[in-house]
């Protein structure tokens, strides 16, 4: 299956937390979207690899994504190495997305930083014909996506653009809450973590409100790009005429 957008995440729930509204907006518009989780999140304090797998499947159904894979790399060890790099290259070549998303490269979690580096390097090397990868024992052709965008996790950055998710914020939160072992559940007997506190979901909404405010909308999600982006001035003027 050829995808329009492919999102790479260190752990199940990272994509939903960071850009769940954007994912819902894309799939609602008919775009084909996939998520590749690098690890099963087995080092997480709450839940297990098995429960998070089921939760990830449920969240993906809520967001109506077309593909979800888990590379089953070692949680807590997502650092650059050739094996991990080639697995990511293989997924890029398999799904041939126009755009890929990765965690922002400055973050408090080492796995997020490692995932960011791996995806950036994989994007470049996926276009080189002399780097060989296989999928189901078939040699893959080189392919390089058009753009790499970074989504926001712990640390903020000055966005290259903000996506209006006002009509999709509720869907995002429903997908986030599909990870019921990870977030607040008054009936849970597992140890409390930062993200399982009741206030964490309020933090999530506050960030979305903050970036929505910056673009004059109710809710927004922020993204970064290391390259300059083309600005469609004519399209903006034409859309303004319709309002």
Residue ranges and their predicted role:
Residues 1-95, 234-240:
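Active-site rim/loop-helix segments in enzyme catalytic domains that contact anionic ligands
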Residues 2-6, 82-243:
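Metal-dependent de-N-acetylase/amidase catalytic core
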């Amino acid at each position: 299956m050829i995808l329009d957008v492919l999102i790479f995440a260190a752990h199940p729930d990272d994509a939903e937390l960071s850009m769940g509204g954007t994912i819902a907006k894309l799939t609602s518009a008919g775009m084909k979207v996939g998520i590749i989780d690098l690890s099963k999140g087995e080092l997480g304090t709450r839940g297990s690899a098995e429960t998070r797998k089921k939760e990830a499947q449920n969240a993906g159904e809520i967001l109506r994504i077309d593909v979800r894979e888990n590379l089953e790399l070692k949680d807590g060890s997502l650092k650059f190495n050739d094996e991990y790099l080639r697995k990511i290259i293989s997924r890029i070549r398999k799904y041939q997305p126009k755009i890929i998303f990765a965690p922002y490269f400055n973050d408090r979690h080492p796995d997020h930083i490692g995932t960011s580096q791996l995806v950036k390097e994989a994007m470049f090397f996926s276009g080189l014909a002399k780097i060989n990868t296989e999928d189901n024992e078939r040699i893959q052709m080189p392919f390089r996506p058009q753009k790499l965008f970074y989504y926001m996790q712990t640390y903020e950055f000055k966005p290259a653009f903000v996506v209006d998710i006002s009509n999709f914020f509720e869907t995002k939160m429903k997908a986030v809450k599909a990870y019921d072992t990870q977030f607040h559940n008054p009936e849970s007997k597992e140890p409390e973590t930062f993200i399982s506190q009741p206030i964490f979901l309020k933090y999530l909404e506050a960030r979305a409100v903050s970036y929505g405010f910056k673009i004059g909308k109710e809710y927004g999600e922020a993204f970064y790009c290391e390259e300059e982006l083309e600005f469609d001035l004519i399209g903006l003027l034409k859309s303004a005429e319709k309002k």
